[in-house]
Swiss-Prot record:
Subunit-structure text: Homooligomers. Forms double-helical filaments necessary for the formation of replication compartments within the host nucleus. Interacts with the origin-binding protein. Interacts with the helicase primase complex; this interaction stimulates primer synthesis activity of the helicase-primase complex. Interacts with the DNA polymerase. Interacts with the alkaline exonuclease; this interaction increases its nuclease processivity.
Key words of the record: DNA replication, DNA-binding, Host nucleus
Stretches the record annotates as Required for nuclear localization: 1112-1132
Name used for this protein in its record: Major DNA-binding protein
């Protein structure tokens, strides 16, 4: 939504490109090596634009840059700097720190040939700038400095073409962090030459002699920026894309057609659609490409303030580090945390890196030969995975097919070429991705470990196609083998899927169970003082706050952190505390319902409630990572194309093309299209912008006299600087929403995924207080030496031997009866289907379950879940990157022995990022996190004015290799919970600086083990500790002890249970136990036998319900099991 009132801002008159000359200091190079994109054989390093690291503290991110000289007046344009800078000189030592991943440059070139992408060609007539002379001119020794260039978005084409003129006479001494540096301005060649002489293919003598042209820098820009933009826009002619951008900025060509005459249409020939539908698709494709390219420039050439994360010295991990070694360790940890998000973008087939194909997916309900309308066309268009179309024939501007000359044919499996394509064939980007792949978990699907071992043994033959046997321990070939089971499948059919993206979250979020329902609007709060009439809306939060006030008053929850603080001294104390809390919750629910009636709040408001959060769309939100900046540009371009579909579909249907040339038709229609699109998507529910007005459009400035400088004289003169555009729109955020109540169809109440069937759970360890029973087991039963899991198993079987000192039997009976009672009471009303892991979640779920059930809601809700990144250590045998040399092993055993020797010699276990369940979802946003999620941009027509609005629907993350937490537990359990859960993956920056689809046929070993662990606790056994059974199953095919992170996964995130099992497992390891059979485990722990011993009688409690429980963590349900296979369960 555009702001109602314009924000007045100011910006200095300054050039939009600077060369920075740094001293070549070891500590600076160390920091840059972690934060930058670099490749061992590429001299250019892509680094983040950060204050006190690469630019000075008071660096202006937005400037009015002089662009045209009219004699007595200089015309200026607003532009903001790119969030990255490019080190181009003195980088030999820096790139030498990069890990060797093989010949990535050759791989990228092969990829371009295979998928018909343009390669950079060095202009033979251009003179290369003399860097040594430039350094000497500012008093620096070229061999002792390292140089980078920071460039505005509008200047990137000028920088690529060598059309920027350095002015060493205006050098400035600046302090960047701890280093004294020199920066040199780069002025646009348009100030010195006429527009007619500014071109990519030719230049004047002045530009030839003075222009800042470096082929290596231009090549990096060609791939990192322009090829990336081209693949996102389905525009393969990268040179024409650069030329169009150059003319657009220097000649104000936003409202003219620039790309269409040179565009080819990829991914259309392979779609099984009619000729008419192909025509519609090509016309829409040309429109959205042109509109998006024009508008992305307008948004990026706008006013943006530096974000909070742009000041390197203010990062907590930097400020709190006392030594350089500590700083480097923290930065490396940050890089590993970010690998969680990179993994999603690489392994998800619906990632923003792949989904550039515009597909026509006909509506199955559409009648044959029916008249095409805007609504029908819009509903049929979707962006989807493009990997299967990269070698297809293409259509040209005249709608004639151009045969593909590729001999490779279609790929059935994801390869290194596809990975290079996703990285826009930029070696620096590809090297960064491979570094991360080498440090990601291996998902075993039966023989993955053996495949890795065999690969390493075969490396001794020096036949690797990527590194020729020079660095197989870290090369891309080994990385692809390691994560082979996790790589995305190449889709055979087009399908509508959400787009997976990584963005920086904003603080605002309404993500509790009922989201927007019962929230007091800000406008209403302002009106209270003006009008005291009793017409206020329901304030649901007031009643939830009353419960938390009760908890704080009774010392149950920490008032600051929200953590559990209550102390349980006995069973009676436990019953008293929980009973009092549930009574308080039920009273607040009653008051809330009374208030709902008093305010005449209809039940429909609950059904229509929305959960929502915002993500930052300013260019500097992800400035800390050049990889995320690369992905950010793809997100903005794709979203703009998606929004442009509304205008394009209506225009194409109303004004179809009757000639052969698409570009000629577009030239005729473009003024109308541009004007309609310019404001069509603002204030429409998804894309939020702000309107800014520059304070002064005319300034008297001391500026370089361009005419004299061209003749060899440096003179500054006072001249009038006039701004071309005074008011503009700036990107602010996206609004992402979710509907908790399923309203996807009229038969939603019959949907098996949301239908709540009658359950008869009798085991408290599967219910709402399980986290408390595990946590306080030692205090509830201080003299019992068996685990919580085994004790409650024996309670269920009425088989607790009297040799166990459980305390007063009558008190125990009362306690057990209460535990069963609250579990069954909660289960009867539970439609949220979230098992609490802390007291605050228990309160939230109990309150809303009680509230909704009292109002007659019975079906399950859609719930939001978070997975946050954490660092864990791993077994080094699956991480060949720990090797210090090229593998030369004759057998697998020799490799394993060598790695064990490395560990004994002190080589640390590799640290990688893993994902764990976030117990309190809302903290993801209050902690200002980087979030990765799926987005479906829905469009709907307003009945009032027939305008189209957008709904940014939170979607799922595709693929079975993204993370094991995202995959369903087991197809045999018939548990549809994963169909109702939407997940966001997050890294909380406050501490260190998330959908599900149907199961694929692949099943990883860890998931098999998890299914068996849960199966163990579903089947009653006598005299065997369930924890011992779990240990036996987990260790069945393992040689090494699982980590706590692994155990949490196996027991579905129950931390107390995992800790109890790990305690036993650590004891076994300390005793050097190798036999993990049940018999041996029982002998080690001297399991309590109850065959002959007398037992306590709890039969009267267990007989209160007719249906008997059949498990510990999950009991049998009475609903009819469906025979529908898991592969048929499509994500809603």
């Amino acid at each position: 939504m555009a702001d109602e009132n314009e924000t007045v801002v100011s910006a200095p008159v300054s050039t939009a490109a600077w060369i920075y000359v740094f001293p070549k200091e070891k500590e600076l190079l160390d920091v840059l090596s972690v934060l930058s994109l670099m490749e061992r054989n590429s001299p250019v390093v892509i680094s983040p634009l950060l204050m006190n690291l690469t630019v000075e503290n008071d660096f202006s991110t937005t400037v009015k840059t002089p662009i045209t000289n009219f004699g007595g007046t200089i015309l200026t344009k607003i532009t903001s700097f790119m969030p990255v800078c490019f080190f181009f000189h003195g980088t030999e030592q820096l790139v030498g720190m990069a890990e060797d991943h093989g010949d990535l440059i050759r791989l990228c070139e092969q990829t371009r040939q295979k998928f018909h992408l343009q390669s950079f060609e060095v202009p033979t007539a251009r003179k290369v700038i003399d860097i040594k002379a430039l350094c000497s001119a500012v008093g620096k020794d070229a061999d002792s400095v390292i140089c980078h260039v920071a460039c505005g978005n509008g200047f990137k084409e000028l920088l690529f073409a060598g059309l920027l003129i350095p002015c060493v006479e205006e050098q400035i001494q600046v302090q960047v962090g701890e280093y004294s540096c020199v920066k040199i301005p780069l002025y646009s060649a348009t100030l010195f030459e006429t527009e007619e002489t500014i071109s990519l293919s030719s230049c004047t003598e002045f530009i030839q002699e003075r222009g800042f042209f470096l082929p290596a820098l231009s090549e990096t820009l060609f791939y990192y920026v322009f090829t990336s933009w081209g693949t996102t826009l389905r525009f393969s002619n990268t040179k024409e894309l650069i030329d169009a951008g150059l003319k657009q900025f220097t000649q104000d060509g936003e409202q003219t057609v620039k790309l269409a005459p040179h565009k080819t249409y990829l991914g259309i020939s392979g779609q099984k659609i009619s000729a008419v539908e192909k025509d519609f698709l090509m016309l829409v494709d040309s429109v959205v490409t042109e509109l998006s390219f024009s508008h992305v420039a307008e948004y990026l050439d706008s006013v943006y303030d530096p974000s909070q994360i742009m000041n390197f010295n203010d990062w907590p991990i930097i400020r709190n580090s006392e030594t350089h070694a500590e700083r480097m360790a923290q930065l490396t940890n940050l890089k590993l945390h970010l690998s969680s998000h990179l993994a999603v973008l690489i392994f998800a087939p619906n990632s923003i890196l792949y989904c550039s194909k515009l597909a026509f997916i006909p509506n199955v309900k559409q009648a044959f030969n029916s008249v095409m309308t805007q609504e029908l066309l819009l509903r049929s268009l979707s962006f989807c995975n493009a990997l299967s179309s990269l070698t297809e024939d293409v259509y040209n501007d005249n709608r004639k097919i151009i045969k593909c000359d590729s001999t490779s044919g279609k790929d059935d499996k994801f390869s290194a070429n596809h990975l290079a394509y996703a990285c826009a064939t930029c070696p620096q980007l590809l090297s960064y991705v491979v570094w991360n792949l080498n440090r990601m978990s291996v998902y075993n699907a039966g023989n993955a470990y053996t495949e890795i071992y065999n690969h390493l043994v075969n490396c001794s033959a020096n036949l690797c196609e990527f590194c020729d046997g020079k660095c197989c321990q870290s090369c891309i070939g080994t990385a692809m083998v390691r994560v082979g089971t996790r790589l995305p499948a190449i889709p055979k059919n087009v399908k509508k899927e959400p787009l997976v993206m990584s963005m920086f979250s904003r603080y605002y979020a309404e993500v509790d169970i009922l989201g927007s329902f019962g929230r007091k609007p800000v406008s209403e709060l302002k009106e209270i003082g003006k009008d005291q009439q009793n017409t206020l809306s329901l304030d649901r939060g007031k009643f939830v706050s009353q419960i938390f006030d009760y908890c704080k008053k009774n010392s149950l929850i920490d008032p600051v952190t929200g953590e559990d603080t209550f102390n349980v001294r006995s069973k009676k104390d436990f019953v008293s505390i929980i009973h009092g809390l549930t009574q308080c919750i039920e009273e607040c629910v009653s008051r809330c319902i009374v208030e709902m009636r008093r305010t005449q709040t209809p039940r429909e408001q609950i059904e229509n409630c929305l959960q929502s959060f915002n993500v930052d769309t300013t260019p500097y939100a992800t400035a800390f990572s050049p990889f995320l900046t690369f992905a950010y540009y793809k997100v903005i371009l794709t979203v703009l194309q998606n929004l442009a579909l509304i205008v394009a579909s209506g225009h194409v249907v109303d004004r179809p093309c009757t000639g052969n040339s698409i570009s000629k038709w577009l030239v005729q229609q473009y003024q109308s299209l541009y004007g309609t699109f310019h404001s069509s998507y603002l204030k429409k529910g998804f894309l939020n912008t702000r309107t800014v007005k520059v304070a002064s459009n005319v300034d008297m400035e001391q500026i370089l006299d361009c005419d004299l400088y061209k003749s060899g004289k440096y003179v500054k003169t006072t001249i009038q600087a006039k701004l071309c555009r005074l008011s503009m729109q700036c990107l602010r955020d996206f609004r992402i929403k979710n509907r908790p109540f399923n309203k996807s169809s009229k038969t939603a109440h019959n949907n098996p995924y949301f239908k709540k069937n009658v359950k008869h759970k009798k085991n408290p360890l599967s219910g709402c207080i399980s986290f408390l029973l595990f946590k306080y087991h030692d205090k509830l039963f201080p003299n019992v030496k068996i685990s919580c899991l085994e004790l409650w198993q024996r309670f269920l079987l009425n088989n607790v031997p009297k040799t166990l000192d459980i305390g007063n039997p009558e008190e125990v009976k009362t306690f057990i009866k209460f535990a069963f009672s609250i579990t069954n009471t909660y289960d009867e009303i539970d439609i949220i289907d979230i098992q609490p892991e802390c007291l605050s979640t228990f309160i939230d779920c109990y309150f809303h379950n009680k509230f909704l059930s009292a109002l007659g809601f019975h079906d399950y809700l859609t719930s939001l879940h978070g997975l946050t990144s954490k660092l864990v250590t791993q077994n080094p045998v699956l991480f060949p990157v720990v090797l210090d040399k090229q593998p030369k092993f004759s057998s697998i055993q020799e490799y394993l022995v060598y790695v064990k020797k490395l560990v004994l010699d002190g080589v640390p276990n590799p640290v990688i990022a893993s994902l764990s369940k976030e117990p309190n979802f809302g903290t993801i946003f209050t902690s200002r996190s980087l979030v990765t999620f799926g987005l479906t941009l829905e469009k709907f027509v307003s009945l009032a004015n027939r305008e189209y609005f957008q709904f940014g629907q939170l979607g799922w993350i595709g693929g079975s290799g993204v993370d094991r937490n995202l995959n369903p537990t087991s197809s045999a359990l018939q548990d549809f919970r994963f169909m109702r859960q939407k997940t966001i993956i997050a890294t909380k920056f406050s501490e260190v600086i998330v959908k599900k689809v149907r199961r694929e046929t692949i099943m990883f070993d860890t998931e098999v083990v998890k299914g068996k662990v849960l199966s163990i606790v579903e089947n009653l056994t006598n005299d065997i500790d369930p924890e011992l059974l779990i240990i036996a199953e987990v260790m069945r095919d393992r040689e090494d002890k699982p980590t706590m992170d692994d155990m949490l996964f196996f027991v579905d995130g129950r931390e107390a249970l995992a800790a109890s099992i790990m305690l036993k497992l650590n004891h076994l390891v300390d005793m050097n136990v190798r036999d993990f059979s049940i018999a041996n485990l029982q002998s080690v722990f001297e399991a309590v036998s109850s065959n002959d011993a007398p037992v306590y009688d709890f039969s009267e409690i267990l007989a209160e319900e007719d249906d008997q429980a059949s498990g510990v963590l999950k009991c049998d349900e009475t609903e009819t099991e469906t025979d529908e296979p898991m592969t048929k369960k499509n994500r809603l």
